């Protein structure tokens, strides 16, 4: 399995971020081909040292990194990515990787 982890940094307007994310971004992202699971953080995101500067963490699961690349290259993936500047005003880091159970 492969995961995509998105770290959305604190936006200029958290309420506007949350509204757009829930009403527009999630429905778009859920249409990406090959998406197996989609989770988002709930409540504050903190680090062991305290506040993190991260507003939301999203984890999307696919069968493989190739499936991730295919999904992000699809029309649905491109539409999802095109909306990011509309709400992620604090910036975002997007990481993807193959995982294994240990």
Language-model segments: what does each one mean?
Residues 1-102:
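Macromolecular interaction modules
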